Regions:
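Generic structural signal for small/hydrophobic residues in well-ordered secondary structure
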Residues: 5-6, 42, 75, 100, ...
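Short, structured coil segments at secondary-structure junctions
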Residues: 58-60, 118-119
Length: 127
């Protein structure tokens, strides 16, 4: 399972950037998911009805994995460990990482700087 981060879905919506082709490829393969946090980030950033409609069409094709107790607990462990090491990645990325770890699969992202710090998290390649 490939789990798309916010940045690559934005690339896809814009039709450019490193993530656009990767998202298109994974959509074609039919095993692309995202997280409830990414869904929140995309929808909270809408600036018009048209943009919201476009995002909703994409989200209809990309199921969002929910944050359940196990994902929240895993995210808390991720955040605590990284902050203790002085390498925090913020709450949203901690929740995304916790969700990916909980459900398995690999995260498709351009943000390797943050997500490569998370022990056990598999990063999908963009090419």
């Amino acid at each position: 399972m490939i789990i798309a981060d916010t940045d690559v879905l934005i690339d896809f919506l814009a039709g450019k950037g490193a993530g656009a082709d990767a998202v298109a490829r994974e959509l074609e393969d039919g095993d692309l998911h995202t997280t409830a946090i990414t869904r929140f980030e995309l929808l909270s950033g809408t600036r018009s009805k048209r943009q919201k409609t476009t995002i909703m069409k994409l989200l209809a094709a990309v199921p969002a994995l929910p944050i359940d107790e196990a994902a929240a607990d895993t995210a808390a462990e991720v955040r605590r460990a990284l902050e203790k090491a002085g390498e925090g990645i913020g709450m949203a990325d901690s929740l995304i990482a916790g969700t990916v770890l909980r459900y398995g699969g690999a995260i498709l992202t351009r943000n390797h700087r943050h997500f490569s710090r998370v022990h056990g998290l598999v990063l999908a390649t963009l090419d």
